[in-house]
Structure formats: C-alpha cells, structure tokens
Amino acid sequence: MGNSNTKESRAGDGSSRAHHGDPGSASLQSDRVSSRRNRVSRGDLGGILGLGTGASQSEPPYERRETKQEREARRLERERVARIAERERSMKEEHVDGGYLVTMGTYTSPEDFNKPIVRQLQIERKVAPFWRGLNDFDDQWTEPQIIAAARGLPVPPADQIPPEDLIPRPLPANPRTEGSSNLDNLTIPITGRSPSTASEHASSNPGSALPSPVSAQAPRANSPFKPRGKAIAAVLGGGGSRNGSTTELMPREINLPHDPFVNGQPLEVFLYKNATECPICFLTFPPYLNHTRCCDQPICSECFVQIKRPDPHFPEGHNENDPNHNPEETAGLLVSEPACCPYCTQPDFGVTYEPPPFRRGLSYSISLTAVGAASAAMSSSSSVNSASLSPTNASPSNGTGRRRNQSVSASSPSVILTDRIRPEWATKLQAARAHLARRAAAATALHTAAFIVGGSENRAFRSRFGRRNNGGSGSALPSPGGVNHGEGENGDSGSGTPSQNDMDQNSRGDPGRGRSGGNHRDRLEDLEEMMLAEAVRLSLAAEEERKRKVSKEERKEAKKREKEERKAAKAAAKQVGPYEGASGRSGHSSASGSTLSLPGFGFGRKRGNSAASNLRIEASVASAIATTESPEANPKEKGKGVDRAVSTHAEGAPATATDPAVLGGSASTSSPRPVPHLPAGPSHLRQMSNASSVTSSILDSRHGSYTSPTHLQDPRSSGLSLGSRSGASEDGGDADRDRDPCASTEPMFNFRSLAQVVGVSLDGENAGRRLSLIEAERRARESGETGSQDSADFGEVETIKTDTATDHADVKPQAEASGSLSVDTAMGRHIKGSPIAQNGSGEVESDSLSPPTVTITLETPATASANDELKQLGSEAAVEPVHRLTE
C-alpha cells in the first residue's frame, strides 16, 4: 500500500542488515528468525488439525477399500502376467535336453508347486522337463515337419522346400580342417545307421557327448563357493537321501556347449521321432517321460505337478478298521492324506525318471567326486559314464529294454514324491489345525463368558428378590435387628433394590460366598440350570413341531376324506338317474311314481321358476341312501309288487299312528306316515289328477304330524311348490312333515289366495286342513257323543266301503295319477255328513287316531261285498279288522 514495505521486503532488509551489521546484531537476528521459524501460523495449525476451509484444504475423496477377493484376483493376474513373461524368456534362453523349465500352459490353474525345487530336480535330471506337447502327430512326417511341430511352428507340406533357418547347422566345437568340415556338411543323416557308425560319429564329434571334466572345471575361477563349501554343496546336491537337494546350498548352473545335433540328427528329430502319448492330458511327448513308481505308467511333468494332497479336513468316511489307521484321525484332528496314484490309487504317489542318453542345456558345475556320488545314486541308464547314446538302447518304451515289473519304494532316492515338490503341506496342515484350535478356544471362551455373565445375573436376580422377600416391607418376618430394611427413607421397599444394611448384613452373614469354592459351585449350578432350561426348551419345541405335523396330517386326511365323500355322492347321484322308477330307491314304487316323480336334481319343472328346489339337491343322495335300508317285501304276500308295512304290534291290537303303512313307495320305518315315493323336487302337477291336488295333499297329511321346517325357507323363491317335499328327509323321519304344503319352501304370498280357493286353513293349530273338516270336528265336539275304540274301527271300515262305492269315479283318477291313496282321505270326506263319525260311547273321531291298514292301489276297485273282498290286493289288511269285530 503506497510506500509501505511488505513482509518480504522487511525480511530482506533485515537479512541484509544482519549481513552488513556487527556480529552481535547478526546473532540476534538469527535467533529471531529461528524463533519465527519454530512458531506455527494459524493457517498451518488449521491445516494440520483439519480446521482450514477452502478449495486448497478440501477433504480428499472417499476411497473404497479393496476386498480380499479383489486383492486375490489382482495377485493371480500379476502372477499370470509374470508367468507368461518368464515362460517367453525361459523358452528362448534355457532348456534341459531339449525340454523347458517352465510349464507350457496345458493347465490354467494356479501353479502352487514350488518352482525352485522343480527347476532343481529337472536340472538334476530327476524329473522330466516340460516337453512341448503336440496335439497331432504323424509317423510319416519328415524331419522338417517334425522340427516345425516341435518348435510350435505351422507344419509345412512334405514336398515343400524347408526354409534355411529351420534346419539347424552344426557348430564346430574345435577348429578342424576344411576338408573335415566340408565332409561333415556334405554328410546326409541316415536313420538306419548301425550302432558302430553312431559310435564312430560320437567319437569323431566330441561336442555331442558329455562335456569333459576339464571343460566342466573351466569356470572354477568364477565360482562363488570355496573348495570345501563347494564339496559339501556337491555332496548334498548329489542326493544321498531324498531330501538332499536344498535351495540354500544349490550349486551354480552352467550352460553346456550348444550342439543342435544328436548322433547326426537334429535334436527335435531325435526326441520326437519315437513320440509317445501321456494318458492323462492326451498330448504327444518325447518318450522320455516320468513313470509312476507303483505301476510304471507314463506321466508328463505338467500333469505330475498338478497332483497334490487334499486340503486339511476332518477324518470323515475313513476306514477305522484299517490296520494302517492314522492315530490323528482317532483324535478328531484335521488330516491330509498323501496323494494317490491316478492309475492304481496307491498312496504316496511318486515318479521316477530316466533321462535321455545325452545332455544339453543347463547343468550343475560339480566335481569329479560329486559326479561319482551322483552316478552311484542314479540308475545305470542315466549315468554320466553311459557308453551308449543310441535311443534304441536307452529308451524304455521302444520294446527292446525290459520294463520294470515291480514297484519302487517310496523312500527310494530315485523316487520324487508329490510332497517333495510341495514341502509346505505340513505347514498348511499345522496352520489349519492352529486356526481350528483358535476358533474352538474363542468359542469356548465366548460360551464360558456367557455362562458366567448369565449366572451372575441370575444370582443377582435371585438375591435381589430373595432379600426383598426376606427383609422387605411385605415380609411377615422381621429383620434380625428389629428394623425393616426394606422400608428405607425413600419408601422404595417394592423396588427390589437392596439397601446398604442388607449388603453389609449379607457380607457379614455369608463370609464364604466370596471364596473361590463357592463361586465355582455357583457357576456349576448356574450352568446346570441353563442346560436344563435349554433341554426343556428344545423338548417343547420338538413337541410343538410334532403336534404341528400331526395336525397338518389330520387336515390333509380330512380333506382327502371329504373329497372322496363328494366323489361317492356324485357317483351315487349319477347311478340313481333323473327318474326314480322300479330301479330307484326301493325298487317297489308304482308305475305312476316312476312316471311322475322327479327327484331333486333340478331336472323337473319348477313352479314359478322357484329357486327353492335347489335346496333339495343335497337331500337327494341322503334320501337315496336311507331308502336302501328299508325292509324288503315279503315274497309270500299277494299283489303286484306293492309295498306293505310290517306291523310291529300284536295281531289283535288296532293300528296306531306309529304303524308305518307304505302305500306305493318305500319310506323309513321311523316315519309316522308312509309316502308313495320320494320325489325331492317339484312334480309335473299338470299331468296329475285330483290325487295330487291340494285337497289330497292336505287330507293325506295327519294333523300335527308336520311342523314347518324354518331352516328350509328360501327368501329367493317366488311361487308355490305343492307336494314337493313328500320324500324322506336326510334324517329319514320327516316324511309326513315335508308333505305339508304349508311348510313348503316357497313364500306365503300367492298361497293365501290359493288356499281360499281350495278351502284350506293356514293359521292356528288346524293349519293345512280343510275348512269343512274343521267345521265337522267342531260340530262333533259340541254334540259330545263318544264311542268305544272297537266300534270306531268298525264304523271306519264300513264308512270306507260305502264311501268308496259312491266316490269310485273320483278315486280312480286319483289312483291313476298318484298310484296310491291313504285311508284318512276317504275318512275325511265321510266325516262331513256321516253319522258314523260318532260312535256309541260318544267319543269323537279325530285325526290323531291312526288309520286302518287298508290299502287302495292302482286299478283296484273298492269292495262291494264280502265275497269280492278276497279279490282285492291287500285284502288281508282290510278284512282282518272286520272279522275280529264280527266275531
């Protein structure tokens, strides 16, 4: 601002003055600068504490933490990329006898074997290298085709000239003359050479044989090992035992002189001309493969490194009777069995390897003594002093060599077990056991803590309530000091909180509670109580589950039975049919009944389109079943198959209202009145005569024998159904009651007008009876004349005879329409003006008396004389009371 100096300028001036001033002032200035430097400004402090606000001090964005699965996936991806790069580098720079030290990618699973150990075993020629597998191989291939296939190049046609870089050129190991060099170049390899020629060629070409000890000792000056340490490393690396090869004292790797030919043939041709197939991956490899120690089956190295022990697991499903049973399995620990052979499933899977009779590529620089030890440990075919380099003598698969016919021990030095290439299996097993033990210990501690805490809470709960009950205000027993400790100054005696006096008294009165023995006993008791409560809870839960299952099964069974009953009802309804005739419910109904009676299935005509007949459908099946239980007719009786009632009274006793008299159809024996048939639905009234009219229906019904079934009233109905309920109901005892037209399921409007026309009373105790009959009874009751029961019966019979003769013209159409007519109908007609309605004793005939057992059937005229009575159907029932009276 104007000429004012800024902070920077002042600092600069101060510093310049300090430089040009005296030493005292300079030291003072330096102290000020250091103190200012030590002080922290407010902005810096806010930045440190996160109090600053502004764009430069904004909070960093939230970074999502990587999950374990994502980290594992990234690690596997890094390993895959590194493995691909290492494979490419190793295949270009390293090889062992024409094979490689890295996998060829046959399996894509993670390579969890120990790669340094496998590499060392392959360089030592104890395990076959990773040969390149061929998908297709033909024995007729030429050398250029074999070389191209072995190098992973496209196989050229047989007649095509191979490129110059495809066929290798031999490099002279020692300077030779031009003639010998040209001779070697002009020599054409012949596959059918004799062993002598091959040996001569091997002797003339020292580069194709093993390197001499002099050449092997050439890099002695560059060796990092001292002579003594190198000898120890060679001895340990030579492998006096199975675990002799160690990575800590591994000798130095050297590259043998490069020679692309073996016995004058290219290396690839020598390896693949007698190729064999791996039985596991089905790829073609050179015949120098690993062989199982147990069954001597070939297996490539890439398949061998995939076989391993199973993960640690509990010994479930193992054979406990096995003599070689692992004691760890009995203890319930985690176990991990050795890998089994994929061919014969023998445990302790291992392989042996016989290398080719030459060495190329990498090797270890070892001394002569180590060479002798290694040659003693190795088989004769893989010895460094092997004289023959012919593959026909060294190859175990070409038939000339004798195949091993017995297994090799798992402890043999030449056997490489799967545990050898995965030495960390024991560490994994111990780690799994330790992890399981930690989990078990944590669970035990958690449960113990829960028991202890729960026990202490239970003890405190019991002690609180116990003290409150013993020393509280509600206790009848006083406290030892005469003071009620439950009534404190706050008056919270019911709160359950102990007072200080109670605590002191309990501590003084029970000094042993704080001891360890008492606490231990309390914990044990609490544990037992908790276990008992848990057992009871589990038992109750199991019982509830059982009851629930039982109820569920019962509901299923009930539904099933209900469904079966409905099916049976439907089948019975179908079997009965729409018309009930001679084959209907009782099999003895008349022709008119079979013609005019329609059951309640809804097939008949409905008067006024009434919906009340729908209620009769349910009763049809029950009535059909009830009628099947009716008593069969006596075959000795006369008549055309007419049902007659079986009297249960004595022969001399008169018939009462309880005598079931069937007048044309079967009915239940419990019914007070017989019915001609059982139509559950409305009848064709226009086809019926006066027998089915309102008059006959009313006169056929006895007074008081029917009460209105209020549960069958249907407010949806409109119209009138007459005589629709003449059949037996579901209980088989409401036949007469259902015949009452006033008890019909139809509503009562439109019925009064019809009742007035026909002269029927609808109200009072005489509902459903003719007005003329009611008037006759009233007059008879006023006259007071009575008579004996016998004379009344005789008068009724005579009345029937006379009235039947006079009204024969009216009865016959009724019989034709309904098939039967009850006797009380004729009685009702005669009572109107006949003097026989009053007997000699002055007793009045009423409807409560039972009708005589006289049946008037179809086409049967009334009897006119005593001689003609014998010709009437059912004459025994009609004449028998007359004979008794006359006698």
UniProtKB/Swiss-Prot annotation:
Polar residues bias (residue ranges): 193-207, 391-415, 495-504, 686-711, 836-854
Biased composition annotated in UniProt, kind: Low complexity: 381-390, 581-600, 716-727
Subcellular location: Cytoplasm
Protein keywords: Cytoplasm
Compositionally biased tracts (Basic and acidic residues): 61-77, 505-521, 543-568, 634-643, 798-813
Biased composition (Gly residues): 44-53
GO cellular component: cytoplasm
Positions of the UniProt region annotated as Disordered: 1-77, 168-226, 381-415, 463-521, 542-608, 623-746, 778-854
Record bears the keyword Nucleotide-binding: no
Principal location class: cytoplasm
Family under the similarity heading: Belongs to the SIP5 family.
Physiological role: May negatively regulate the SNF1 kinase.
Protein's recorded name: Protein SIP5
The organism of origin for this protein: Chaetomium globosum (strain ATCC 6205 / CBS 148.51 / DSM 1962 / NBRC 6347 / NRRL 1970) (Soil fungus)
Phylogenetic placement of the source organism: Eukaryota, Fungi, Dikarya, Ascomycota, Pezizomycotina
